[in-house]
Swiss-Prot record:
GO terms under biological process: regulation of cell cycle; regulation of cell growth; regulation of DNA biosynthetic process; regulation of DNA replication; regulation of DNA-templated transcription; regulation of transcription by RNA polymerase II
Alphabetical list of SMART domains matching this protein: PHD (SM00249)
Source taxonomy: Eukaryota, Metazoa, Chordata, Craniata, Vertebrata
InterPro entries tied to this protein: Enhancer_polycomb-like_N (IPR019542), EPHD (IPR034732), Histone_Mod_Regulator (IPR050701), JADE3_PHD (IPR039550), Zinc_finger_PHD-type_CS (IPR019786), Znf_FYVE_PHD (IPR011011), Znf_PHD (IPR001965), Znf_PHD-finger (IPR019787)
Tissue expression per record: Ubiquitously expressed, with highest levels in placenta and uterus.
Protein name: Protein Jade-3
Amino acid sequence: MKRHRPVSSSDSSDESPSTSFTSGSMYRIKSKIPNEHKKPAEVFRKDLISAMKLPDSHHINPDSYYLFADTWKEEWEKGVQVPASPDTVPQPSLRIIAEKVKDVLFIRPRKYIHCSSPDTTEPGYINIMELAASVCRYDLDDMDIFWLQELNEDLAEMGCGPVDENLMEKTVEVLERHCHENMNHAIETEEGLGIEYDEDVICDVCRSPDSEEGNDMVFCDKCNVCVHQACYGILKVPEGSWLCRSCVLGIYPQCVLCPKKGGALKTTKTGTKWAHVSCALWIPEVSIACPERMEPITKISHIPPSRWALVCNLCKLKTGACIQCSIKSCITAFHVTCAFEHGLEMKTILDEGDEVKFKSYCLKHSQNRQKLGEAEYPHHRAKEQSQAKSEKTSLRAQKLRELEEEFYSLVRVEDVAAELGMPTLAVDFIYNYWKLKRKSNFNKPLFPPKEDEENGLVQPKEESIHTRMRMFMHLRQDLERVRNLCYMISRREKLKLSHNKIQEQIFGLQVQLLNQEIDAGLPLTNALENSLFYPPPRITLKLKMPKSTPEDHRNSSTETDQQPHSPDSSSSVHSIRNMQVPQESLEMRTKSYPRYPLESKNNRLLASLSHSRSEAKESSPAWRTPSSECYHGQSLGKPLVLQAALHGQSSIGNGKSQPNSKFAKSNGLEGSWSGNVTQKDSSSEMFCDQEPVFSPHLVSQGSFRKSTVEHFSRSFKETTNRWVKNTEDLQCYVKPTKNMSPKEQFWGRQVLRRSAGRAPYQENDGYCPDLELSDSEAESDGNKEKVRVRKDSSDRENPPHDSRRDCHGKSKTHPLSHSSMQR
């Protein structure tokens, strides 16, 4: 059908926006469908294309239009298909629909899922073995890094590329691996050559060093085992290398008949078990199926249980089957290979009937036969063999040492460079550095071989019941040790706690005692250093005192007139104890104390205790209260050396002792009372008696001091009891005596009278000639009269003191007597 061009009102239809419906009518006519009166949805418009066209004469900027150069320009004349009524085009409506969860209708059971290849790994997982193999086994140290920096500078000057750290680590690893592999091969080759050309090499089966034509000795090129052709069943020696059965399969099995590995082994019928050919020959129950090929080994099951139960006398292992000594009376068992290693006598005897008999002897019978052989042959063949063996060993060790020193000759730089794909120059630098570093490390490898690392790993083993029982037994023993340690630690801590508590109690009692003495205004008799450190032992010193002035002689004569000169004059003390001493004499005695001559002082030491007790009981209160001058002069002005010297004087006297004195015993009533009084209240007695401070105090110390060893061996308990007793006595000392019963006061006076009538206890600690008595009997009688006159004058001049001092003097007497009576 011919297409007609529609009539246009303009000259150029391209410029008029007319619309042609001819094509639509044409399509409607052509379609011949029932809906021919229906309006079309699309129409073709040409005006859009005509509006885009420009005439060729129209001048336009070349940048503002496009030039069509294709050949399908005429197709644009047909028009563009557009919707007939754009307003009636339906608008799409959208809504979001929730995703529907798919119901799982079938779940594949996991028990039916199996991995076909155990080596394959799932995607996303890492194979640890592959990762470990890919990691380099050598790490650079600081020296390597510094050297690598210098190498890169030299390579940059040469115009070569640098070498990074990872590449150097891989190069060193390859060098070590090549060196290790080539050294192992060289050692095997050297060992094989040594065995092959050694005249003393023997067959591993028959133990014979001889060979003959057609029965040559063959060596395995891998394990270097030496066998005869007939012994191992080699029908024809192959050209080139030869490997034994186990080396062909690449395994290293263990013999079922002995605990040894390696050697000339053959398999059984099943092919799963291996046994030495020598073991199969020497054990009578075992046989070989094909003697020509010497395989397979059969009748292992015919070995009786009694043979399996035998224990080897050489290796002490109950493994495999043992043979016994051929001597009928000997039952010693041993493995065949153990007998070969220890050099036992193993004989192969060919019988008349072409039967082979095997004779084996234990260590004892082999030595007897060797001794008989040495008697027949005087040549020391054994010594020569040992020397040859030692020479062979030393030669082999020397070869190995030379091989280790020349390790660098086993590595080729070209092979390493080809394997790593590196330039030969860089590899050669690293090779020389590796050689120097290994030389500085005594030719030792820079890291251990891989085989050693794998062997060093702990392989899991099947735990048997015996192993578990042994483990539990060791665990129980360890727990028992822990329990004992815990008990010992707890006991130690308890002892430390009790020790600390005792020390705390001692410290508290000491502080309490010191506080009470300070409150009472008394001197600190028991100071801290006296309780913690015991007094030193008594020492007798030889002193030379300077000559005194006339005033000192006058003062000393005044003092000596008031005291007895010897123990014989003790009766005069009792006769004048009721007399009063003038106050002037008291002051004069106190002031002139530091300048006493030692000769006159020694005369008064023996009678000072009795005189002080009598004066403390019956004298006036003026005798019981010391003055401040006496306190400061008597207790604080004595050096330690002088006290020690006078302490030794107290037991000398006139060089005589009283054998009838009851104070020689320290465990009686009176003796213990005197010791307790003089020891505990020595400071108070010095003030009450108005005597020199060292007289009664040191006499009491001389009667109750023990040796140094006894003082230092006192326990904490004894020390605590001593402080407790001192505190109790001090409390009795401070308390007033109003509450004391007349009976207790009476007993105290009786004990005081008894102790005053006796001389103090004397100990012969030593003799000092410079401190001897110097006054005579006549002088002492004259001094007695002067003492009586001064006492009468003091009674008339000095009034009695207050009752408080009197009570204070009584409190020093009665508590002491009361405590002594209780003891």
